Amino acid sequence: DVSDQLAAISLQGPTSCAVLKKMGLSNIETAKPFDIMHFPFHDQTLMVSRTGFTGDLGYELWITHELAIKMWDELYAAGEDHGIQPYGETATDMARLEAGFIMPYVDFTEALKTIRYKHDQTPFELGLGWLVDFEKKHFNGRNALLKEKKQGSRWKLLKLDIEGNWPALEAIMYNDKKCSE
């Protein structure tokens, strides 16, 4: 495990490829989604993956922690003409939700650990029914899912837009002094 030896920076957005090219990463535009490329960087190797969690063009850059600040500075300088700005976890979280990327234990919990008594979240409730392969003749829950597909789901994961003051992240919302589900 080399986690404590590496630093990672995520560069996301429509100009991310142009920024990396300006930084000197030649042929970065040839990277396909989920590709990993390696580039020389101050006598070390910079690993770049064409990945991200925002639903936009994006890359993740990996370097030893000793060169992390230097990488940040060069990345920031290369992106200055593009209006590069640092962003945090909340912005990433909003972008991934807008892109429809859901996370286990954040947006839903697995059936065995669900917080609602006697309520297992199904793929149809989460908008993931298209992932269920009913061509497969036998799997646990197949009959229940076929029934739900035919009759519809009782619950559905929805996006809620709130204008004005927003509730805190992971806040419980109340209606008539009762916790909403």
Regions found by a protein language model. Name each.
Residues 1-181:
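Conserved, structured C-terminal
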